[in-house]
């Protein structure tokens, strides 16, 4: 699927729950986008997909590196990727932190496909530069 003169956006899903990853991937593909899945923030950070990602859907609470820590890492690398957070926990402090740091949305599980679609549409707003892959300064960075 082409969007104007730009390639089909790649949406990356980072969640330690495989069933959540699979469900979101199926939905993303059903609306015509490419989807890549990662079981951890670390796997996403070392993947070649990072530089192709137009939108990141990430769980807040994961082992080793949380979604908020991933957001902070990407910010420190100057990666401009729109982020949609998802969580099963009612955590107003995490929500406030994520949105203050520039997250597109913060969805509480279970959320509807319409909720996710609206967040994706905001993240991929063609008025901005969101359909373009991420831009990052990664040289010399470690996680």
Residue ranges and their predicted role:
Residues 18-36, 123:
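Two-component/phosphorelay signaling modules centered on CheY-like receiver
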Residues 37-55:
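Acidic, metal-coordinating helix/loop segments flanking the phosphotransfer/catalytic sites
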Residues 39-40, 66-70:
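Acidic catalytic/metal-coordinating carboxylates
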Residues 62:
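Receiver (REC) domain active-site loop signature in two-component systems and cognate sites
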Residues 93, 111-121:
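C-terminal output helix
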Residues 121-136:
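The C-terminal output helix
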């Amino acid at each position: 699927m082409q969007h104007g003169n730009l390639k089909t956006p790649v949406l990356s899903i980072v969640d330690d729950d495989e069933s959540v990853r699979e469900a979101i991937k199926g939905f993303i593909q059903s609306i015509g986008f490419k989807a890549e899945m990662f079981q951890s923030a670390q796997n996403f950070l070392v993947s070649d997909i990072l530089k192709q990602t137009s939108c990141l859907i990430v769980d807040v609470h994961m082992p080793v590196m949380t979604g908020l820590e991933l957001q902070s890492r990407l910010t420190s690398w100057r990666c401009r990727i729109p982020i949609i957070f998802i969580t099963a926990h009612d955590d107003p402090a995490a929500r406030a932190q994520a949105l203050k740091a520039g997250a597109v949305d913060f969805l509480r599980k279970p959320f509807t496909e319409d909720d996710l679609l609206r967040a994706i549409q905001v993240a991929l707003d063609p008025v901005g530069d969101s359909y373009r892959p991420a831009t990052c300064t990664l040289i010399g960075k470690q996680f």
